[in-house]
Amino acid sequence: MNPAYCPEVQAKRRKTFESKRTTLIFYQEPRVNKVDGHSLSVIRVDKHVADEWLELYHPFGAPRGNLLCLGLTDGIQIYCMMTFKKSRNPTYYVELSRMWMLPTYDVVDGYDILSSEAVKFGVSNIVAYVNMSFENYSDYESIGMKYERSIQPTRWWITPDHRMSDASRRQRMLSTEFMLSNGWLPVYDCGQRVYVFD
């Protein structure tokens, strides 16, 4: 089942009057449990473990092609994770593909600790595409990334168990009528902000 429909991260839709289209917004539970990031250990997370964790807790699940996965743990539970992959943009070396905390937890200085550790692994010249539907851009600014530009909202097709970008739908030559008749709902995200770290 798609994590967007789990109790931790519930999908909500709202009508935007100016565009008359359905926008996908993800609701996150408030971060009520505070954990000091300095009391946790930084680990390099195995790709399979990282994928399982992200599939459970991140609205879009695990990305493909991770080169480096770092997490903060107490030895039992991973509370915070950052994953990096080769950048799609040739101007940048690495893309920060996921930056996420365990639902309802606020890991104090968690992202700072992980980004400092990533630099020790030689990660530099980073780009991040921040999905405004569910990510907080101030988290990226807090680790020293700088805003570069915005990307317009993107159309997605969703069911309770799956999601597909409109570009993938067109590439597979699936018509809008086919998607609607098979239970897919067209929604738009809230756009993206591009952040960079040199």
Locations of regions flagged by a protein language model:
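Acyl-donor binding region in acyl/amide transferases
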Residues: S41-R44, T73-I76, C80, F84-L185
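BZIP DNA-binding basic region
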Residues: M1-T22
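Short, well-ordered beta-strand micro-motif
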Residues: G71-T73, T83, V194-D198
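Short amphipathic alpha-helix that is part of the acyltransferase structural core
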Residues: T23-R64
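A short helix-loop-beta-strand connector motif used in the catalytic cores of GNAT acetyltransferases and
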Residues: G61-L70, G75
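Short hydrophobic/aromatic beta-strand or adjacent loop that forms the aromatic wall/cage
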Residues: L67, C190-V194
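A short acidic, often aromatic-flanked loop/helix-cap motif at beta-alpha or helix-coil junctions
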Residues: A11, K47-D51, R155-W156
